[in-house]
Amino acid sequence: MNRFLLLGLALLSASAQADCAYRALAIEPETPALYVGAGERVRVEFDNYKLDGEVDSFPEPPLRIRAVQGGKACEVEGGIWLRNAVLLDAGEQRLLVQSFSGSGGELTFYDTSSCAQLARVELPEASWSLQGEQLVIGRNCSAAGLAHCVEREVHTLNQQCLPQ
């Protein structure tokens, strides 16, 4: 009887955990003025006004999230978005982007159907990573990368694949 209870609790616990599987989108130029990353159902677009040379960020709004079929789009204003920090969850319902300004940065989670902001985490330093279903943020870092951080702040992703 106890084995069945433990098995039931283990199954319940496993089903209560999120299965977010955020993955980085490759943001590539479709034209010199338009950079795009796409999943199966969602496409992310950034306007680019620096038409010569390599681009590592997009300082001009808006960021557009567009359905691949039907073309319906919504827009996010503001931000200087990093090209190498655009992630889409496995269900393509949430988009995670890193942005920065002169005073710091942030990670922002958006709903891909409405562009509504779902969550935001401040990044006084740029060191962070997704490790399974946890968002790990480095604090008091001497260099880039979590290995160089004195402190680590861990946010477990909830059922909606958002940091708690």
Where on the chain are the PLM-derived regions?
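Exposed acidic/polar residues on beta-strands and adjacent loops within beta-sheet cores, strongest
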Residues: 18-164
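Positively charged n-region of N-terminal signal peptides that target proteins for export
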Residues: 1-4
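Sec-dependent N-terminal signal peptides
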Residues: 6-9
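N-terminal signal peptide c-region/cleavage motif recognized by signal peptidases
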Residues: 13-15
